[in-house]
Structure formats: C-alpha cells, structure tokens
C-alpha cells in the first residue's frame, strides 16, 4: 500500500491510519500512530475449544489455549491473523499469534472476538489464571486474512502454521522488539 508523504490535517492522518490497518500494513500503521496498533480489554471466558485442538509444541497435549477479548465494534479497523505481543500478565511482554474477526469456521453469529494464543504460556498463570486480567495486545504483523475451514482438523493445521510463522517472525525481529518493548497497559 502506498500513501503519500503529506496528510492534510488530522482527518487525512486518520484516514491514512485506517487505510494502513485495513490493508494489514501494521508497520505503516505503527509509524503513523507513533506506536504499534493495540487493543486492550479484560480476558473473558470462551468456549475453551482451543485447548482441545492439537498441541502448542511437539509432545505437549495442551492445545492452543487462548486469551479471549470481546471486541466492541462490529467492524474493526483490521481483521485477520496477526503476530502479536501481550502486555499485562506480569513479567515481560509475551509473544503470540492472534485472530481478530468473526471466527467463520466456529460460528456464524458475526460477533467480533480477539483470540490470542501466547507462544510461551506463563506457567505461573496455570490453565485458568488470566481470566478478568486487563491486557493490551499489540498487533505487530499481519500473517493472513481470516478464512473458513472445512473442519476442526483443517483449522488446527492452519493454527499450527500460524504459530510457526509467528515464531519465525519473532526470530527475525528479536533485536528490534527488545529495543521498543514497554510493558504497560
């Protein structure tokens, strides 16, 4: 996406930010905002389906546990699957992968949800320890658009690919993330 170097006032800058987010250009959105685009909210209970899908790492049977945040708008500025960083769980920010959208494989209600799978689940939280915590999720890089899969097996394979892609992204951007990380909500 190409946006000119000059924006006409606040309205032009706002439009440029919305266009960058809609296009999935999270680096441009971060430059325009002066920080990574983020969503804050309290972690809520979900259907607990993620923990029954696959394994977060080879040899583990923990599935893809997620932190679920309700999204108040029916049309978020950005949708899809993203590399993210989670703040607010104590300790350093946690790397993750997140889906922001309507979960087309799981339900057709049209309800927007942010589901975050932390690549390194903090053991101190246990399986249930994040509920009701206020977290901030920074959307760092868009991996792909949201998609409808033919079943849970296909969805699990896609999530596993997303997790691998997120690990690779963090590996390639490790030094950059260390320099810009601030753990505050």
Question: Model-flagged regions — what are they?
Answer:
Residues 1-5, 40, 46:
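Conserved beta-strand termini and adjacent loop/short-helix elements that scaffold enzyme active sites
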Residues 30, 40, 93-95:
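Acidic/polar loop patches that form or flank catalytic/metal-binding clefts of enzymes
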Residues 1-34:
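Contiguous mid-protein beta-loop-alpha structural module that forms a pocket-lining wall or clamp
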Residues 46-185:
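Phosphate/ribose-recognition catalytic cores of enzymes acting on nucleotide-derived substrates
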């Amino acid at each position: 996406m190409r946006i000119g170097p000059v924006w006409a006032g606040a309205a032009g800058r706002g439009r440029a930010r919305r266009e960058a987010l809609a296009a999935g250009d999270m680096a441009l959105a971060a430059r325009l905002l002066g920080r990574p685009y983020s969503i804050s909210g309290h972690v809520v209970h979900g259907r607990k389906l993620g923990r029954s899908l696959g394994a977060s790492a080879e040899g583990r049977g923990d599935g893809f546990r997620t932190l679920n945040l309700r999204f108040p708008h029916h049309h978020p500025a950005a949708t899809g699957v993203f590399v993210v960083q989670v703040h607010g769980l104590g300790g350093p920010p946690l790397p993750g992968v997140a889906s922001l959208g309507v979960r087309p494989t799981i339900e057709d209600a049209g309800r927007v949800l942010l589901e975050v799978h932390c690549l390194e689940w903090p053991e101190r939280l246990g399986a249930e320890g994040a509920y009701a915590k206020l977290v901030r999720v920074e959307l760092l890089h868009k991996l792909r658009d949201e998609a409808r899969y033919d079943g849970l097996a296909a969805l699990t394979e896609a999530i596993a690919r997303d997790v691998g892609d997120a690990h690779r992204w963090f590996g390639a951007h490790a030094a950059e993330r260390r320099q810009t990380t601030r753990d505050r909500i």
